[in-house]
């Protein structure tokens, strides 16, 4: 058995460790110290520590890189909350509903622990910590207000070099000029030496137009703009197209965003403290 290192050392998963504690705890005690030196309290404390560690769905964060997320709000009751530093930048007088937390929480989940529910996302890069700024509600937002917030956020968090922005307009960009939102995003990236990863925007529900152009700020030239594909690599049914100014190819890349009518075709996310949810969209391809 490749899990046995020598006559007294072997590798076990948490469930096997718990089973060993229950059925043959003296074997572990002999391997640690003289059994006569262990009190009943020592055994109970060690068992409680082991149970707590086995029950963790995710390890504690350490010195992992930090990604900035600018989105709707973040639900601090989710299992990975330790990995996310959250700041609500909306006026405290603005009432928030449960829906206002779902989109932003799902986006940060993908960055922190996406491969947990989506094995296709496992790229060997590990987990990332997130600094999450809530700038919008689920009901919509003023793009100019958000852009002003983004400039202040980036200026105040110079240690973060990569930012995720999964917010965008339902309207199409104009064929002959870059949107004011994208132009400002380009300026911010140039001034502060950062890069934004921007969702390529979705075709809104109920719209039947084919070849719908992307919405701002997905026409940002300096940003990495991400469209979505299904798990077979086909372009998702809700994706929109470029180019920008007739010759800048946008979106730049595509990644898994989920698509289809059954839950197995969608992305698994944690958007609240109620368990897994199934979603699709460029918002979840970008992170």
Where are these regions (language model features)?
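Extracellular S/T/G-rich loop segment that most often corresponds to the catalytic His/Ser-adjacent loop
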Residues: 71-73, 79, 213-287
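Short, surface-exposed basic-aromatic patches at helix termini and helix-loop junctions that form
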Residues: 22-26, 187-190, 215-220, 245
């Amino acid at each position: 058995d490749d899990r046995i290192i020598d006559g007294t050392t072997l590798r076990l998963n948490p469930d096997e460790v718990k089973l060993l504690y229950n059925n043959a705890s003296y074997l572990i005690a002999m391997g640690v110290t003289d059994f006569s030196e262990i009190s009943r309290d020592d055994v109970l404390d060690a068992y409680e520590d082991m149970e707590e560690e086995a029950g963790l769905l995710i390890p504690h964060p350490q010195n992992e890189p930090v990604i900035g997320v600018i989105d709707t709000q973040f639900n601090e009751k989710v299992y990975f909350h330790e990995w996310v530093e959250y700041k609500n930048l909306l006026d405290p007088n603005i009432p928030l509903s449960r829906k206002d937390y779902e989109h932003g929480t799902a986006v940060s989940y993908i960055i922190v622990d996406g491969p947990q529910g989506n094995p296709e996302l496992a790229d060997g890069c590990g987990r990332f910590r997130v600094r999450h700024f809530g700038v919008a509600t689920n009901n919509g937002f003023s793009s100019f207000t958000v852009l002003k917030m983004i400039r202040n956020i980036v200026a105040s968090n110079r240690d973060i070099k990569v930012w995720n922005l999964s917010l965008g307009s339902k309207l199409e960009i104009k064929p002959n000029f870059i949107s004011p939102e994208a132009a400002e995003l380009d300026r911010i990236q140039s001034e502060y030496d950062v890069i934004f990863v921007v969702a390529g925007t979705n075709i809104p529900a109920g719209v039947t137009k084919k070849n719908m152009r992307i919405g701002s700020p997905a026409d940002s030239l300096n940003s990495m703009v991400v469209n979505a594909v299904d798990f077979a690599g086909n372009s998702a049914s809700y994706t929109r197209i470029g180019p920008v100014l007739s010759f800048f190819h946008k979106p730049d890349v595509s990644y898994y965003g989920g698509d289809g009518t059954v839950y197995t075709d969608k992305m698994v996310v944690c958007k609240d403290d109620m368990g897994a949810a199934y979603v699709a969209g460029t918002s979840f391809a970008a992170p």
